[in-house]
UniProtKB/Swiss-Prot annotation:
Gene Ontology molecular-function annotations: carbohydrate derivative binding; glucose-6-phosphate isomerase activity; monosaccharide binding
Chief location category: cytoplasm
UniProt protein name: Glucose-6-phosphate isomerase
Subcellular location as annotated: Cytoplasm
Function of the molecule: Catalyzes the reversible isomerization of glucose-6-phosphate to fructose-6-phosphate.
Enzyme Commission identifier(s): 5.3.1.9
Keywords linked to the UniProt accession: Cytoplasm, Gluconeogenesis, Glycolysis, Isomerase
Amino acid sequence: MGKSFLDCESLIALQEIATNPVDLTLPGTLSQDRIQQYALSAEGFTYSYATERVDDRSLNALRMLAEERELIKQMESMQQGAVMNYIEGFQSESRSVLHTATRAWVRDHDLKDEAASIANHSEREAHRLAEFLYAARSKFSTLVQIGIGGSELGPKAMYFAMQGICPSDKRIFFVSNIDPDNAAEVLKEVDLKQTLIVVVSKSGTTLEPSVNEELFKRAYQDKGLSVADHFVAVTAEGSPMDDKTHYLEVFHLWDSVGGRFSATSMVGGVVLGFAFGYEVFFEFLQGAASMDAHALTPIMEKNLPLLSAMLGIWNRNVLKYPTTAVIPYATGLKYFTAHLQQCGMESNGKSISRQGKEVHFATSPIIWGDVGTNCQHSFFQSLHQGTDIVPVEFIGFLQNQRGIDCVLSGSSSSQKLFANLVAQSLALAQGRDNDNPNKRFKGNRPSSILVAQQLSPRIAGGLLAFYEHKFAFQGFCWGINSFDQEGVSLGKELATQIIGLMSGAAPIEFPEARELLRLFNVLQ
């Protein structure tokens, strides 16, 4: 794979095809044959892409591009523990990427070396978790997870994804922001004596969880309660938090498991296991592990995350659409798009190739969205008639989670919900002509639909892994490092200096910050 992304023959072919892409507004385009042909069912999901602006020509070229970029080979290498987090010739993390190993132990696998070690350690941690939960779930009624980024977004998204279907008498809260109001609003809701605090930080020194942990510790001390009897740490071995004298229990994660990919490690395991029971967490892992195996399917049209990734490449790099909206028609996925923003944009929001050279093509689109049907009444006007075309990824389910529904005018609420999903996809694709220009819909606005029977723990795990692999495949295709996040560091470094200015502990050689602080009356 010596050539760059822009030099791929198949990409050049795709650019030629894009001068005259399929017209979804023409009568008969969305035929029964097309809808049946442009669909894939696997792992409990059915994926429809008939409303994408692709045809056999573009799909063939996308398949060739995936083969040129050796995407399946790279996915195999990643899952087997090859060093994938690197920049050639420059200082970088130079690590394996082994979030898949945190759930590989729930199925048969042929992992070796570091990957096998992580899988074995993950199994041992899971068994320790099961023992811990047996006592903790009988003693505590509430859990507060303190973390930031992947220590909050993924676990929070998955907790709410399963909350509607898994019976639980537990109360769960998440504290992430360094804004003290975030912690204060949780503190007023909980009985500290009945509350387990889970602090998640791989390094053990991350600013936000460190500050919030201290805030909660003081609240416990003010009540005369033992911190060590209520606090649990999830951290790397050897970190400052890896000390059982200060915690009720310590669970471990590894450098090769990035934060945004860590929901299937103990980062998600403690909170999900506490909320719903260990068996539910195990089922969740099974769904993710099954999607990991499926992601190695060598044929693009039979590989869910690879197919979605390549359609995303088509929309981003060939049709030149700058954003992607993810719209789940499920209340349980109300925090899922926020997780995808981190998973996609922190992974692929890069402008440097693995060779350390600036790239001259678009990488990650802006990812955004909200839950349907709510967002039909907010930003869908722009999706249908705005000046920017936004590809939409719809997610839907045939059955609701809670089993409460009513039939009105001949259809249930669940049927009405799903009808709206399908209607939006067709309306975006086909549009509608009208003599009144204000009522005209141009159409040719692409979308895909991913559907499962019900949002169960297994499907939640599969959905999580589907997007993890989609973003990884896209990063492999672009030739960038999807597994570091250098863009997070500069602002953090400057914030540390500014905190020093505000506390009087830093020298004055930061005039720009000093003047801004004076402007806002922070400094006199």
